């Protein structure tokens, strides 16, 4: 019988390089078991086919997972023109094949232009979006007729990295909720030949623009070699780089951690990251126009060293 895994409090962010073929939740659970972390969450799903950056939040860092979910992201996509599939990627069943027209660089740029900016995008029917409390992919697998939702998304840039028919390589910088599978599908229709994603890699997620990612294999090897789990994680404050920073003295930091409101005309308005005098993050707060700081999310136990 395998020994029972004893989980412990562990706080921080792991920049996982997710492998292809694994769901985001399965990747999270694999990392959580290796780290023996009590609590964990990911910051937005990557398709099973996709690889690349999947920030995983553990312990108190799960309180900022939702903030990272809404961050800007960048992807490298390999697109195959001329074939559509039911999932809009290479994991799906082919639906239709069409001839790929002769395309110049100018043709590609003209076709891509309408997909840059604030656009309306219909999600793939094989997606984790919920309808009636159930993921769309579950309904699709049962053969139900589905009308996937259309949502406004923000695509900041699309760069052509290379084209050799039928393969097209793109780099896409976009906001939260953008489906690169949908972009490939819709681009294929504009070109008149259909398309699907052959491979997809997420390069970065704000604020981790130059991430030092780690694979599950490297994580396992490091832990087997005796590396302390907490040294493999980024501290919570690494995920707070985009917020205005307030540093409180010991007395006011204690009051903030007790949920009390504070007031100072010098506080910057809006959502802020609050730190104690030793640099330990106390939590997130919201400052109103009158300089009143209200606690939103409080971090606890960050100075505790997890048991081995």
UniProtKB/Swiss-Prot annotation:
GO biological process assignments: mRNA pseudouridine synthesis; tRNA pseudouridine synthesis
Top-level class of the enzyme under EC nomenclature: isomerase
InterPro entries associated with the record: PsdUridine_synth_cat_dom_sf, PsdUridine_synth_N, PUA-like_sf, PUA_sf, tRNA_psdUridine_synth_TruB, tRNA_sdUridine_synth_fam1_C, TruB_C
GO molecular function: RNA binding; tRNA pseudouridine(55) synthase activity
Known EC number: 5.4.99.25
Pfam families with a match to the protein in the record: TruB-C_2, TruB_C_2, TruB_N
Catalytic reaction equation(s): uridine(55) in tRNA = pseudouridine(55) in tRNA
Keywords: Isomerase, tRNA processing
Catalytic residues of the enzyme: 47 (nucleophile)
Family membership noted in the UniProt record: Belongs to the pseudouridine synthase TruB family. Type 1 subfamily.
Function: Responsible for synthesis of pseudouridine from uracil-55 in the psi GC loop of transfer RNAs.
HAMAP family per record: TruB_bact
Protein name: tRNA pseudouridine synthase B
Gene behind this protein: truB
């Amino acid at each position: 019988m395998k020994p029972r895994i004893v989980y412990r409090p562990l706080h921080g962010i792991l920049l996982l390089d997710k492998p292809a073929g694994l769901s985001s939740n399965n990747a999270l659970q694999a990392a959580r078991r290796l780290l023996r972390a009590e609590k964990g969450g990911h910051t937005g799903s990557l398709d099973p086919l996709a690889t690349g950056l999947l920030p995983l939040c553990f312990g108190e860092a799960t309180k900022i997972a939702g903030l990272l979910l809404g961050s800007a992201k960048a992807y490298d996509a390999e697109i195959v023109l001329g074939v559509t599939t039911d999932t809009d990627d290479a994991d799906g069943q082919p639906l239709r094949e069409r001839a790929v027209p002769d395309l110049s660089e100018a043709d590609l740029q003209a076709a891509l232009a309408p997909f840059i900016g604030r656009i309306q995008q219909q999600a793939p029917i094989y997606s984790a979006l919920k309808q009636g409390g159930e993921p769309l992919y579950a309904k699709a697998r049962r053969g139900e007729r589905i009308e996937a939702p259309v949502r406004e998304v923000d695509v900041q840039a699309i760069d052509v990295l290379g084209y050799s028919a039928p393969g097209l390589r793109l780099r896409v910088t976009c906001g939260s909720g953008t489906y690169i599978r949908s972009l490939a599908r819709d681009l294929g229709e504009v070109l008149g030949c259909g398309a699907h994603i052959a491979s997809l890699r997420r390069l970065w997620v704000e604020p981790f623009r130059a991430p030092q990612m780690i694979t599950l294999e490297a994580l396992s090897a490091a832990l087997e070699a005796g590396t302390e789990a907490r040294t493999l994680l980024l501290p919570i404050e690494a995920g707070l780089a985009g917020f205005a920073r307030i540093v409180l003295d010991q007395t006011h930091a204690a009051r903030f951690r007790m949920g009390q409101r504070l007031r100072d005309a010098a506080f910057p308005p809006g959502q802020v990251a609050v730190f104690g005098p030793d640099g330990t993050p106390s939590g997130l707060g919201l400052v109103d126009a009158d300089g009143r700081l209200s606690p939103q999310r409080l971090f606890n136990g960050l100075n505790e060293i997890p048991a081995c």
